[in-house]
């Protein structure tokens, strides 16, 4: 077990009051076959990156109740294309959702792997590499267990010097450091060796583990440690206009140069606009985020050859065209925002669900 930093930030514990209120909204719907119109029994329906999910009933119906905020609702069924629907308190259908799933086109799947070779001993050759770039190399990652590595398939594209990893079923990861079991529907994992650039996308569903009182206390401390300075912590602080109190400092890259200039007022009308329950951030380019309330993990400093005396966590976001934040810390469009620096080092092993609250 990694050594814990023994601290509790009062501002952190009592921040984000809007999200901590017990306000919820319902989501009802039915999952059917797009071609026949027949209901699909047992379809997986969940809000990605949360602990909230269910299975459709015999008539295809489902019901969820969600805390106010934004979510990506994921609907999947074996042999069918997964569907994603963005929902929230202020943008959801007035009536019940009717989700029509299409059967997967096997010919398209075959075309995807054309020009590649499935590696027969893929796990032996690339397994640890995959874990390092998917789960991470943090101290918490050492306490994560991939329960079903047999569902992974590894493909190597010689002409492009690219590795692609597929999963034939949801990955199951037990995070013994944070006390979660994660079911992860892997959408894409690719790594380009020529540029040493990789990325992965997918849909995680969290299940809170049950443990002894000592385990529960340890998990609570570890979750707080992972949350402090995280992207989720930053996004919520930006939403709440509490960046300074929470220990965040922002700098924006000057266009055409690598120089950064401190953002003196992150809430000015040119950058920050509140509309009903949403906050729109109008930033393009690279935004550097420093977290001054907690030092980086020593393992990160050693791996990246930074001085061990470094006392500030430095991350950055490459932003295509701004983004919109909802009160639980969900934001969109997430595909247009890329992590750099400390946040990019903290991968799945540090991930917390949107329904996590520091005071829990």
For each feature predicted by the language model, list its residue ranges.
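Structured interaction patches on ligand/partner-binding surfaces of diverse proteins
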Residues: 54, 81-97
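Hydrophobic beta-strand segments
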Residues: 43-47, 73, 113
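Short, acidic Ser/Thr/Gly-rich low-complexity loop/linker segments typical of extracellular
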Residues: 50-61
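Short, ordered, surface-exposed loop/turn motifs in non-cytosolic proteins
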Residues: 25-27, 34-49
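Bacterial Sec-dependent N-terminal signal peptides
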Residues: 1-28
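A short, solvent-exposed loop/turn motif at the edges and junctions
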Residues: 47, 74-86
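Surface-exposed, low-complexity/disordered segments
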Residues: 97-360
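A short, amphipathic beta-strand motif
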Residues: 27-33, 60-62, 99, 111
């Amino acid at each position: 077990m990694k050594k814990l930093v023994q601290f509790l930030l009062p501002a952190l514990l009592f921040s984000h009051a809007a999200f901590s209120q017990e306000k919820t909204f319902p989501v009802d719907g039915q999952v059917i076959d797009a071609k026949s119109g027949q209901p699909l029994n047992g379809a997986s329906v969940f809000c990605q990156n949360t602990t909230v999910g269910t299975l459709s009933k015999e008539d295809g119906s489902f019901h969820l109740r969600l805390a106010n905020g934004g979510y990506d609702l994921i609907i999947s069924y074996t042999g069918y294309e997964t569907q994603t629907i963005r929902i929230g308190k202020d943008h959801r259908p007035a009536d019940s959702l009717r989700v029509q799933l299409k059967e997967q086109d096997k010919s398209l799947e075959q075309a995807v792997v054309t020009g590649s070779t499935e590696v027969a001993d893929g796990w032996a050759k690339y397994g640890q590499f995959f874990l390092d770039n998917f789960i991470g190399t943090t101290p918490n990652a050492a306490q994560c267990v991939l329960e079903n590595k047999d569902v992974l398939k590894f493909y190597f594209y010689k002409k492009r010097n690219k590795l692609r990893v597929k999963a034939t079923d949801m990955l199951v990861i037990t995070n013994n450091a944070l006390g979660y079991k994660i079911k992860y529907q892997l959408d894409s994992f690719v790594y380009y060796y020529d540029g040493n650039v990789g990325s992965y996308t997918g849909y995680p569903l969290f299940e809170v583990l049950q443990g002894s009182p000592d385990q529960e206390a340890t998990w609570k401390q570890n979750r707080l440690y992972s949350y402090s300075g995280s992207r989720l912590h930053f996004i919520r602080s930006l939403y709440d206009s509490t960046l300074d109190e929470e220990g965040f400092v922002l700098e924006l890259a000057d266009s055409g140069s690598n120089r950064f200039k401190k953002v003196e007022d992150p809430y000015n009308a040119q950058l920050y606009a509140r509309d009903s329950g949403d906050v729109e951030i109008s930033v393009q380019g690279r935004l550097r985020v420093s977290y001054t309330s907690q030092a980086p993990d020593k393992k990160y400093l050693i791996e990246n050859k930074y001085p061990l005396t470094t006392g500030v966590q430095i991350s950055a976001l490459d932003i295509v065209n701004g983004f919109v934040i909802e009160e639980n810390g969900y934001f969109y469009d997430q595909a247009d925002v890329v992590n750099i620096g400390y946040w990019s080092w903290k991968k799945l092993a540090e991930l917390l669900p949107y329904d996590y609250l520091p005071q829990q």
